[in-house]
């Protein structure tokens, strides 16, 4: 089990997320103001394990047509889908690091936002 609370850093600002729910192989975390969330869960099916890491950020957004304010959520999620045997944590870490490095390369997020593939 991860430590409680979890700290994530967004744009240089640390956000503390306390565990608010834990059931077996799944835990939910949230900041005290509810503007940041994280879910970590694991599902086994056959000879595979799927791990979900999902981070959310809530903002107040104004609808440009009606000028009404409402909450909007942004989520970043990763699914690690691995066989039970064949890969160790170090090897998985290399793949995760490569993925992270590519995503934060200059211009990649903008291209993803523009729906390039």
Predicted regions and their residues:
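Charged, low-complexity, helix-prone segments enriched in Lys/Glu/Asp/Gln
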Residues: 48-50, 60, 98-102
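Amphipathic, interaction-prone secondary-structure segments
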Residues: 21-56
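Compositionally biased, intrinsically disordered linkers/stalks adjacent to structured regions
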Residues: 88-117
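Beta-strand elements of well-folded, non-transmembrane domains
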Residues: 44, 57-63, 80-84
